[in-house]
């Protein structure tokens, strides 16, 4: 039995979030046992989509849809196993990944036009609509990190485990390749067993890449949570190169990333105890918020507004928050 509560009129702070004095928070929604993780804003800027990291069940939510202007929301999809990675593709569709070793990416076309409560039968991979389909050629592995190239040619993905590789999928030729440290991109011949193929090809290992974000210059940032580093993938020349982009003693387990076009900041959630929300301006790592018990997840931007989830332990409601700088609040 699924419950979600609207908190659009909430002005108090019952959530336990500790905020930088220059910021305010506003609770938009609360859910029980939805495990909200990644968030994206639709291409037309009207919808906020939230992945739900639940176990596969026809009654377990996998994707929430929230209309940004009205606050109306619904469960768009049930049934995936540990839905996590989420991005808007160049064609406006949603790619929703499953975070387990045999996970798939699922493509959802025109999500704003779909009726609520669509379903996937995870045992048969059948869906309630042709608009939701598994992307078999993208590969089976633990999908969390995802980014698209600036020119719309490639999807970059990371296998989120201690010896996980980075993959590149050509959206036009449908070839899947793995990154080799010295040889560049090598062809994966069996997408269903991509991890095994990557090991045979000696793909470069990373220690749990949690999220990926495309910068305005086309470089791809990678949150390597176990090392505490933000890495940079530069794939703009013949031989791709990975280097450290940010390493800071205060940053322990970087998780979700979001580039802020207005402020030119990188937003970072930190899956430590307590959990933090950081903003990196190129010189200083600023603490914007922290929470002593909930995990801060899914940071994303809509204009100057910052959206985050509070993913709670069992028994406590998960919460969606909108953060605003007080200077911007006064301008409204």
Residue ranges and their predicted role:
Residues 1-4:
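Sec-dependent signal peptide recognition
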Residues 8-9:
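C-terminal motif of bacterial Sec signal peptides marking the signal peptidase cleavage site
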Residues 12-332:
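Sequence/structural signature of beta-propeller domains
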